[in-house]
């Protein structure tokens, strides 16, 4: 594939593997062009043989594409907590008295949404010869819902107020609700506490979308390592490219914690990464090179970070050594 040169790659199951190397050396070709293709129905086969694939249940490419295809999608809908929030509002005495069920609190439902903005909280303005733009809906004041729906309040807050909360605020507000609090706390721990839970997905950065996807995987449920080893169940393979882009040091530390949690749950994680802090946390490193283009596509060194750091030919080794020394 591209510039890969008949290499043999070993990726330990249930561990964190980081693929390193200079730009253009074959990192993406290895991950997207080979590893991801192994699990496709009609793969573009670029390998001679592969083993161990049956130990993997699903392969997920956790990229930086948007978390939703419409302006209505948001963190709360993507991580599935909005369903729980709607049920909570529907159980309130006033809601039951008025015959409101959980669907009433969906901003996609005509009976509950603001008739002016159709549940968006914003109005799309079509501009001649200019890109379309969005403006605040004055009818609902950006709350998305009609007055009757907004009149139902949980601890003094309407469903519109809840969607306007930041993840930090919502985690505290729903502290008594285990499932909601756990998911919101995970989002908070990955450095996303400043986002509104109802923030439209098109306004999120690629890095924010990627971390939301990682948290979603963490909420799917824990897999017993004993079950995996005894072949009673299979774990997933997660392929993640450059997740540290645009992150501050503290957020990188939070990202590392998320990657370790996936591994602790029995999954296999493969990351293409340039950040030495993440390299140093790997169980296994595959260092590609030695150069880019036709002079790349080979494995320069493979193994634990300490082994790769001592390589005489690796362009990554000096930087990794410095990171390991702290």
Regions found by a protein language model. Give the residues of each.
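Conserved phosphate-binding elements of NTP-dependent enzyme cores
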Residues: 1-326
């Amino acid at each position: 594939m591209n510039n890969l040169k008949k290499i043999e790659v070993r990726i330990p199951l249930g561990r964190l593997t980081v693929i390193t190397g200079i730009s253009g050396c074959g990192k993406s070709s290895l991950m997207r062009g080979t590893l991801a293709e192994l699990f496709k129905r009609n793969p573009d086969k670029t390998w001679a043989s592969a083993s161990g694939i049956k130990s993997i249940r699903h392969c997920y490419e956790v990229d930086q594409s948007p978390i939703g295809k419409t302006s209505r999608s948001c963190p709360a809908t993507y991580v599935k907590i909005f369903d729980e929030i709607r049920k909570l509002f529907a159980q309130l005495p006033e809601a039951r008295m008025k015959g409101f069920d959980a669907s009433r609190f969906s901003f996609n439902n005509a009976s509950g949404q603001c008739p002016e903005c159709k549940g968006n909280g914003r109005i799309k303005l079509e501009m001649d010869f200019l890109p379309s733009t969005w403006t605040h809906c004055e009818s609902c004041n950006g709350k998305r819902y009609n007055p009757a729906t907004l009149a139902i309040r949980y601890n003094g807050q309407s469903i519109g107020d809840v969607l306007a909360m930041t993840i930090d605020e919502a985690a505290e507000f729903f502290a008594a609700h285990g499932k909601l609090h756990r998911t919101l706390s995970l989002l908070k721990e990955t450095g996303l506490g400043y986002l509104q839970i109802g923030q439209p997905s098109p306004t999120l950065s690629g890095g924010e979308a990627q971390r939301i996807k990682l948290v979603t995987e963490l909420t799917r449920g824990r897999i017993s390592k004993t079950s995996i080893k005894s072949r009673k169940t299979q774990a997933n393979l997660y392929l993640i490219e450059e997740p540290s882009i645009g992150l501050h040091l503290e957020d990188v530390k939070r990202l590392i914690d998320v990657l370790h949690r996936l591994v602790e749950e029995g999954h296999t994680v493969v990351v293409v990464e340039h950040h030495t802090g993440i390299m140093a946390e790997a169980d296994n490193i595959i260092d590609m090179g030695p150069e880019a283009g036709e002079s790349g596509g080979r494995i320069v060194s493979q193994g634990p970070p300490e082994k790769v750091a001592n390589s005489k030919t690796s362009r990554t080794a000096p930087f990794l050594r410095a990171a390991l020394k702290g």
